[in-house]
Amino acid sequence: MTYPKRIPINAWSEVHRVARPLIITFDAYNTLYATKLPVMEQYCIVGRKYGIKANPSTLTNNFPHVFKKLKEDYPQYGKYSGIKPEQWWSILIRNVFAPNEIPDEMINEILMRFEGFDSYFVYPDLIKFLKDLKSRHPDVILGIVSNTDPIFYKLLKNIGLFETFSGHIYLSYELNLAKPDRAIFQYALDDIISKQPHLLEKYTREEILQHCFHIGDELKNDLEGAEAAGWTGILLDRNDKYGFLSNSISKPMRDEYKLSIDKIDNNSINTWEANTKQTDTLQLSERKYVVSNLEVLEELFP
């Protein structure tokens, strides 16, 4: 078969569909959920309550440098530096607003705002996808593989998704492993098999790999990382930021600066309205796919 291959939603057939899914893991931020408004707009909304006048564009421009330096100075959200993740994020907020002096109460309010639906939006297609998937494949194991810290658990509970993935959540902070390293996917698979030993009654480990899928919004961390581990990687590109779906393959690659901006500059309401119009799937190789929404992805797992 020649790649890349574009598959319109009305052209799916058995030849295009993949093996029955046994394990599907998801990235977290900008995959399961996203911010309703760009992050720095939300920071400024809180800031105004405390008399802090800041421009969201200025804070957005500050963010990549602040984020990069903080990761270098306090790796893994401060895990090895004697500070808790909440303190790590407090430092980030303070440094993003610099040279403005901001009160601790304001930082605490920002942190609380990002613990649930005040800031975040769960895409409607996720809920439908999970429900339909479980209906068609009741034994499929769902998990999360994410480069994040344990504050994530509180958020996941507050937005009603914790029970869906409980028992199969793999965070870089806890494992000292991170995407795109194949080791975090290998760890996830080994852990799932240890908790679900019945899988080995029917399949070998190598055979199970043919039924493992990971869905996420980053080319390197999610699509390529999963494929390198022997999984099928699915890039959920709601904004066509990589250009695959619009045939703009000449789009510049997302460097560290652009990826940092991607993390914070999303308006999920606008994104949702736009990505539902794209209904094609792009198959890049035998184990790499690109979709713009999860409704399209349902065709992959009939």
Curated annotation (Swiss-Prot):
Gene3D superfamilies: HAD superfamily/HAD-like, Haloacid dehalogenase-like hydrolase. InterPro entries: HAD-like_hydrolase_domain, HAD-like_sf, HAD-SF_hydro_IA, HAD-SF_hydro_IA_REG-2-like, HAD-SF_hydro_IA_REG-2-like_cap, HAD_sf. Pfam families: Hydrolase (PF00702). Keywords: Hydrolase. GO terms for cellular component: nucleus. GO terms for molecular function: phosphatase activity. SUPFAM superfamilies: HAD-like. NCBIfam families: DREG-2 (TIGR02252), HAD-SF-IA-v1 (TIGR01549). Belongs to the HAD-like hydrolase superfamily. PANTHER family: HALOACID DEHALOGENASE-LIKE HYDROLASE DOMAIN-CONTAINING PROTEIN 3 (PTHR46191:SF2), PTHR46191. This is Uncharacterized protein YMR130W. It comes from Saccharomyces cerevisiae (strain ATCC 204508 / S288c) (Baker's yeast).
